[in-house]
């Protein structure tokens, strides 16, 4: 089983022949012309060389590359012509064979969509070889400034045993996250987003790729706010609640129409229009207390003493 080393200074101390798994992350800006960056910096290569010197005699140390993930986000306007070509380069080979077979992708920053490029390398190099490089070539983008931001994440292991893998063609996935915005600006975001690649390919069964337990975590979904709408009239809410209770007791489906209560005794001359006007007037005057007098009419406080006897002893009149 591979041993994961967090601190690069501890790499040379692991000299018992056990493979050491490493995960690397970096980011850079893509400018006009050709942008080329090594996957392993020179400072780390010196650590690997020291590790190779401390191993048992007769065993050659190998760099077993596993996967390379690039996240590209545009920094130019929409509908700008041109495209970029991303290639995985092996600088230890001369001529056109430097470009690894099947590890070339094309992307248009002017489309306004960030992209995710997954290179399934499964290749190995000796410790004294130059590391792989990522080459991004600008073709037809009319700008002198940077046109994209690249975030790279890759994994490899250092060990005394050589393993042979079969490389898979590179894949490009467009991200629907908005223009000039990418969710892969940190190593944790990259690990979370590429989890489906481990589920849909044989990369999941490779122990060298599963050095961390949080690799196969599904990205959390964005929380949406509560849905707001127009509330029903206050006079309807209590009746709906009572009717729903009655329907539940009777086993109804709740499809009956809720009728508004009549605000005054119905007569033959009253119409639905007059009732709606009266209900609208009562809603507007809801701030005035309403009570019923002796005649059964709706009156306010300013009219409650008119048209009736207020003296408790009517015999005096």
Swiss-Prot record:
<dbReference type="Pfam" id="PF00803">
    <property type="entry name" value="3A"/>
</dbReference>
<comment type="subunit">
    <text>Interacts with host glyceraldehyde 3-phosphate dehydrogenase-A/NbGAPDH-A; this interaction plays a positive role in cell-to-cell movement of the virus.</text>
</comment>
<keyword id="KW-1038">Host endoplasmic reticulum</keyword>
<keyword id="KW-0941">Suppressor of RNA silencing</keyword>
<keyword id="KW-0916">Viral movement protein</keyword>
<dbReference type="GO" id="GO:0044167">
    <property type="term" value="C:host cell endoplasmic reticulum membrane"/>
</dbReference>
<dbReference type="GO" id="GO:0046740">
    <property type="term" value="P:transport of virus in host, cell to cell"/>
</dbReference>
<keyword id="KW-0813">Transport</keyword>
<feature type="compositionally biased region" description="Low complexity">
    <location>
        <begin position="255"/>
        <end position="276"/>
    </location>
</feature>
<keyword id="KW-0945">Host-virus interaction</keyword>
<feature type="region of interest" description="Disordered">
    <location>
        <begin position="223"/>
        <end position="317"/>
    </location>
</feature>
<protein>
    <recommendedName>
        <fullName>Movement protein</fullName>
    </recommendedName>
</protein>
<keyword id="KW-0472">Membrane</keyword>
<dbReference type="InterPro" id="IPR000603">
    <property type="entry name" value="MPV"/>
</dbReference>
<dbReference type="GO" id="GO:0016020">
    <property type="term" value="C:membrane"/>
</dbReference>
<comment type="function">
    <text>Plays an essential role in cell-to-cell movement and long-distance transport of the viral genome. Mechanistically, movement protein is recruited by viral replicase complexes formed on RNA1 to punctate structures on the host cortical endoplasmic reticulum. In turn, interacts with the viral genome and mediates virion movement from cell to cell. Also acts as a suppressor of RNA-mediated gene silencing, also known as post-transcriptional gene silencing (PTGS), a mechanism of plant viral defense that limits the accumulation of viral RNAs.</text>
</comment>
<keyword id="KW-0899">Viral immunoevasion</keyword>
<feature type="compositionally biased region" description="Basic and acidic residues">
    <location>
        <begin position="302"/>
        <end position="317"/>
    </location>
</feature>
<dbReference type="GO" id="GO:0044158">
    <property type="term" value="C:host cell wall"/>
</dbReference>
<keyword id="KW-1090">Inhibition of host innate immune response by virus</keyword>
<dbReference type="GO" id="GO:0052170">
    <property type="term" value="P:symbiont-mediated suppression of host innate immune response"/>
</dbReference>
<keyword id="KW-1043">Host membrane</keyword>
């Amino acid at each position: 089983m591979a041993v994961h080393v967090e601190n690069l200074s501890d790499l040379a101390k692991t000299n018992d022949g056990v493979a050491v798994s490493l995960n690397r992350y970096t980011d850079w800006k893509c400018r006009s012309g050709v942008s080329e960056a090594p996957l392993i910096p020179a400072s780390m290569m010196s650590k690997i060389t020291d590790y190779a010197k401390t191993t048992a005699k007769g065993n050659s140390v190998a760099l077993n590359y596993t996967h390379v993930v690039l996240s590209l986000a545009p920094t130019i306007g929409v509908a700008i012509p041109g495209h970029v070509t991303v290639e995985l380069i092996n600088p230890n080979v001369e001529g056109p064979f430097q470009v690894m077979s099947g590890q070339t992708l094309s992307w248009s920053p002017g489309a306004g969509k960030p992209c995710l490029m997954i290179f399934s390398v499964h290749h190995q190099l000796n410790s004294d070889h130059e590391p792989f490089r990522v080459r991004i070539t600008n073709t037809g983008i009319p700008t002198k400034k940077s046109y994209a931001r690249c975030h790279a994440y890759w994994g490899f292991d250092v060990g005394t045993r050589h393993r042979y893998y079969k490389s898979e063609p590179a894949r490009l996935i467009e991200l629907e996250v908005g223009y000039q915005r990418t969710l892969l600006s940190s190593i944790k975001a990259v690990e979370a987003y590429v989890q489906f690649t481990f589920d849909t390919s044989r990369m999941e069964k490779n122990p060298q790729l599963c050095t961390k337990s949080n690799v196969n975590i599904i990205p959390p979904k964005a929380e949406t706010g509560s849905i707001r709408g127009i509330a029903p009239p206050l006079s309807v809410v209590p009746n709906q609640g009572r009717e729903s209770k009655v329907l539940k007791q009777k086993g109804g489906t709740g499809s009956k129409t809720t009728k508004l209560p009549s605000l005054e005794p119905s007569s033959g001359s009253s119409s639905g229009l007059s009732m709606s006007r009266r209900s609208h007037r009562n809603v507007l005057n809801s701030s005035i207390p309403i009570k019923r007098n002796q005649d059964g009419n709706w009156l306010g406080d300013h009219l409650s003493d008119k048209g009736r006897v207020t003296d408790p002893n009517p015999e005096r009149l």
